[in-house]
């Protein structure tokens, strides 16, 4: 009796499989009009419900010990997760996927995972039909219908990372290393889960990623593309807050980034500086970078680099100078000469003025600006500042240059600028709150100088 019942159940499952296929595929390329197609789908749905009802009755007669594991209909399985769908949704291509998986996919892609079709939009709608059929099927078959965990969703996007890293770190072919590094660069850029998994989930991952570069000598011309992709992947990984300390404390990272600041493609040098800028957001990393040869390489990049490279290097040095002891190090490395040279040439003026305003509280920095005659460049900027912030930073530098030494002969230079152009009076009226405050302070010094009184510290 049990055998006969099981045979009936198998027959019903096969019938259900055929009906499900008809429901899901109906209208996919045939010539029937919409009314006829809709009528066919409705009939198929009714038939599926009838079969499921019969199947439930049949299954209830089978002793639990005789029930063999059931095979989930492939129409109920999400092709992204390879598991039965919990919340099926339809995307623009007409395909149905598990909501949590396709939502993660659509954050980074605009193609259908199955058809590779470019989607007209990234919206999805619930597939209530399939959801109801899955629910009934699970009840009939006593199938556990659990919600997928976040870890399983993450696993979808990290399953091939270990293999890619293995190819980068141990491949005998440079071409294969480049291909794998390029894919790692792509995945670490597009998928936040990959950034988490790469550092936290793979043992010694940073060392393995950088190993091809650590074996290179000073001449890296033969592997410029490999270097660029590895450095850029490292930058992508450094964006994640929890990765910054782990990356910076790896003994290979700072030396290899320093090397990449000096040599490589323009993009490699920019991204090496961007990585250091990202890492330097953490206070402990400011110390690590400040104690390395990266400081001199960053200053050289400020002087020699293109617009974007100089911007990234300046951002890094700015972060480093938040730590007091690093100010003297960047001055010793030649920052003042490099920065003033770029400003005189009209390049990266806003970023570099912000940096010099920060470091103008350091005595040696002010002395070097004085020797280079930078005060006259500041006057020129203050007469026609490109923005409120530019004017603010320029007047802060002027204030700090003269606040430490209000010698009359020095103040005479500032007084002449005010007499000829009214520079500080304009700033006091039209500048930002901070700029106006500094300009007022300078005007008070000038007034005291004109009256012959020794300027007093505020």
Curated annotation (Swiss-Prot):
EC numbers on record: 2.3.2.27
InterPro entries for the chain: ARM-like, ARM-type_fold, RING-Ubox_PUB, Ubox_domain, Znf_RING/FYVE/PHD
Keywords of this entry: Repeat, Transferase, Ubl conjugation pathway
Cited CDD domains: RING-Ubox_PUB (cd16664)
Functional note: Functions as an E3 ubiquitin ligase.
Keyword Cell inner membrane: no
GO biological process, alphabetically ordered: cellular response to water deprivation; protein ubiquitination
Coiled coil: none
Organism of provenance: Arabidopsis thaliana (Mouse-ear cress)
MF (Gene Ontology): ubiquitin-protein transferase activity
Location of the U-box domain: 71-144
One Pfam family cited in the UniProt record for this chain: U-box
Catalytic function, reaction form: S-ubiquitinyl-[E2 ubiquitin-conjugating enzyme]-L-cysteine + [acceptor protein]-L-lysine = [E2 ubiquitin-conjugating enzyme]-L-cysteine + N(6)-ubiquitinyl-[acceptor protein]-L-lysine
Superkingdom as given in the UniProt entry: Eukaryota
Repeat region (ARM), residues: 241-281, 283-322
Pathway the protein takes part in: Protein modification; protein ubiquitination
Protein name: Putative U-box domain-containing protein 46
